[in-house]
Amino acid sequence: GEDDATGNIELTLVDAATGDAIDYAVALEIREGANNVSGNILKEIAVEASANGKCAIEELPIGSYTIQVVSADEKSEIVAAPFSVTVIAGQTITKPFSVTKIINDDQIRFVLRWGDEESGAPSDLDSHLVGPRVKGIGNFHTYYSDKTYEEYDDEDGYVKYADLDVDDVSWEGPETTTIYKQTAGTYRFYIYDFSDQEDEESKNMSDKSGAIVTVYRGSTLLNTFSVPTGQSGNLWHVCDYDSVTGRVTSINTVGYWPNDGSSTVGMSEAEVLRDSLSRKISDIQDYDFVLADNAYKANMKTVLAEAENLADNSENMDDIRAMIQKLEEIKNDIQSVGTIGNVKLDGEYVDWETIGDEDHYIVNGIRIMGVNNTPGEIEVAFTNTSDDPLEVRSEDVSGQDYIKVITVTNTVS
């Protein structure tokens, strides 16, 4: 019958910059055939602002169509963007689509979309942008754990250069990454299959995700990339963008990036080492406020200054590796004395409890139980992880020779 020769489409239009349903009017131009953006328009549909991005297209003859979303008025000012859809007899196709508003002419936007749960697509694909830093050596890297790259400027304060505007962890997208302020150099854009990161032979991103990346500049749709099929791996290198020439170059390859590689996606060996050194520096800096002001701490600060200089300026990978090892030893040294074996007050064993620094999971003090007056000489025996005595230190309560500050109170418990 007539109904068997037609099908329906239900659209949900979301704003690529927020991930929310659009609250402005747009227009749809429907053309016959896939990837057809210049032929005769079969049907035009207005989607009102009050529709919250919802639109039903009913009783379309079976076949393939291209639907182009365009601005309805000056308020919407969106970048015209097409997508293809196949109408199946007697069925209603549900389709989410991301709409991007016109951005500045010197801004670049990458929008990722992929399949839904029913399609068997991976639930979580992640967008990664690697690009040149404004200051210092190396590249910045924006992704779900470090969404914004910004630098401090004396006149303007913190300036945002790139941002993962929208992060989606449960199918479809959109995930949106924008270069807000360009720096001379090459930007590399990747998609990482977080769902299948442990499976080197997985083809889920390649064959099941249906992932598409659209690239915009200003009011122009520059490129549309589809993930290559039949490829094993968890990392899709989509494209490179040269900010000097303004050219987007298709890379479009899928390969494997090691498990737990989210923080290092797209980095060279040198960049991975610098990233590791920066994280070690951050780890040690976190201990600064729980350490006593003594020779040990002063030496640690000297080493940290050397490490920061290497991270910013050195091209010698052996020096960076050696510094990473040195900082790891400092961290182990601090943590190894976190277990207290026993406490003596004026030569007598006493009951005590630890005072922990919850932010860093270390002990930074003790409380002696049942003390009502000012304590005298204390002895604290630390042990290492194998419970062998590490060191016994005898010090007046006001002393500052401990690696960690030991605080003694007269609290009665």
Task: Please annotate each region the language model reported.
Residues 1-4, 95-104, 326-335:
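Conserved "repeat-terminator" motif of extracellular CCP/Sushi domains
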Residues 7-16, 108-112, 341-345:
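A short, amphipathic beta-strand motif
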Residues 16-43, 122-126, 354:
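Short, ordered, surface-exposed loop/turn motifs in non-cytosolic proteins
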Residues 45, 52-59, 176-179:
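Short, surface-exposed beta-strand/beta-hairpin micro-motifs centered on an aromatic residue
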Residues 61-74, 187-193, 307:
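A short, solvent-exposed beta-strand micro-motif common in secreted/extracellular proteins
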Residues 91-268:
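Intrinsic-disorder/low-complexity signal
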Residues 268-341:
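Beta-rich interaction/scaffold domains
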Residues 372, 382-386:
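Asparagine-centered strand-capping/turn motif at beta-strand->loop junctions
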